[in-house]
Amino acid sequence: MYAIFKSGGKQHKVIKGQTIRLEKINQSIGTQIKFKKILMCCNGTHITIGKPHIHNNFILANIINHGRHKKIKIIKFNRRKHYKKQQGHRQNFTDVLITNIHNNYREQNNGS
């Protein structure tokens, strides 16, 4: 079973037991969090697509680490004008462990 959810303006495809790196989440390490913006869920035989989200489905995850990415340098430079500007940036991130994907799919009988 896998699911696609939205967090931090990005979409992520996950399976149970996977560790993923997300934009910073302001919770402490060890906290269990619930993602409710599920865009798609597949249980092996049936695919459910949300419009835009699937209601009553959620993903449970535990926060395992906070950190910062490597520094990137932003450089603006104009030749012959004696102009050079440098800036650095480090993005914060959170590592989470997916513990459960809760899928509320129930097969409906169409009378046949």
UniProtKB/Swiss-Prot annotation:
Keywords: Ribonucleoprotein, Ribosomal protein, RNA-binding, rRNA-binding. This protein binds to 23S rRNA in the presence of protein L20. Belongs to the bacterial ribosomal protein bL21 family. InterPro entries: bL21-like (IPR028909), bL21-like_sf (IPR036164), Ribosomal_bL21 (IPR001787), Ribosomal_bL21_CS (IPR018258). One of its GO terms (biological process) is translation. Pfam families: Ribosomal_L21p. This is Large ribosomal subunit protein bL21. One of its GO terms (molecular function) is structural constituent of ribosome. It comes from Buchnera aphidicola subsp. Baizongia pistaciae (strain Bp). Transmembrane segments: none annotated. The keyword Acetylation does not apply. One of its GO terms (cellular component) is ribonucleoprotein complex. Disulfide bonds: none annotated. Part of the 50S ribosomal subunit. Contacts protein L20.
